[in-house]
Regions:
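N-terminal beta1-alpha1 cap of cysteine-dependent amidohydrolase-like domains
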Residues: 1-85
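A residue-level signal for conserved active-site and pocket-lining positions in enzyme catalytic cores
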Residues: 7, 115, 146-148
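Fold-independent oxyanion-binding glycine-rich loops
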Residues: 11-12, 43-45, 59-61, 93-96, ...
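Short helix/loop capping segments that flank catalytic or ligand/cofactor-binding pockets
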Residues: 18, 126, 156-157
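A short acidic, often aromatic-flanked loop/helix-cap motif at beta-alpha or helix-coil junctions
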Residues: 46-51, 123-124, 154
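Cysteine-nucleophile active-site neighborhood
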Residues: 63-140
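Conserved anion/nucleotide-ligand pocket segment
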Residues: 137-155
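Conserved small/polar residues in nucleotide/adenosyl-binding loops
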Residues: 159-161
Length: 161
């Protein structure tokens, strides 16, 4: 029998605007290829939290989606901080990335406090930033990605990748 890997997908109902479920499917597939048995727990507002968590994935949502989940999210904040401190791997994209930071300020000036797992804050802009990215890391080589967002993120401390 293969080792089970419990994956929590955070708020897939409200925070999946750009097909972030594809990240969940990709992680599931890669784990299965390496002989693991991935088990995905979709956590939405009002759901029970799973007993065991090996990894957490979170996606993007419009500002309205973030406002919709924020109360429930803060009820889970201490648990999420504790899991992060324990080294549980987490991949946060877009809106949940912003909420894992210190705060997110929308274009209209509304400030949504985050839970402070990531030492950064994000400020919404009137112009979207869209396009391919290539950054070089001494540790990982070229890191290739794609951006499509209106928020500009500022690091509070230097992070090396």
């Amino acid at each position: 029998m293969s080792q089970v890997i419990d994956i929590v997908s955070l708020y897939p109902k409200d925070m999946n605007i750009y097909g972030d479920s594809g990240n969940v499917l990709t992680i599931q597939r890669r784990l299965a290829l390496y002989g693991y048995e991935p088990r995905v727990h979709a956590y939405n507002q009002g759901c029970d939290w799973p007993e065991h968590v090996d990894m957490i994935l979170g996606g993007g949502g419009q500002d309205t989606g973030q406002k919709k989940i924020i109360d429930d999210f803060f009820q889970r904040a201490d648990l999420l901080r504790s899991l992060a401190a324990d080294g549980v791997p987490m991949l946060m994209i877009c809106g949940l990335y912003q909420l894992f930071g210190e705060y997110f300020e929308t274009v209209d000036g509304t400030r949504l406090d985050g839970i402070g797992v990531i030492g950064a804050y994000t400020v919404g802009q009137n112009v979207r930033m869209i396009g391919n990215l290539v950054e070089h890391s001494d540790q990982f080589g070229d890191v290739i990605g794609y951006e499509n967002h209106s928020g500009q993120t500022f690091l509070l401390s230097l992070i090396h990748i």
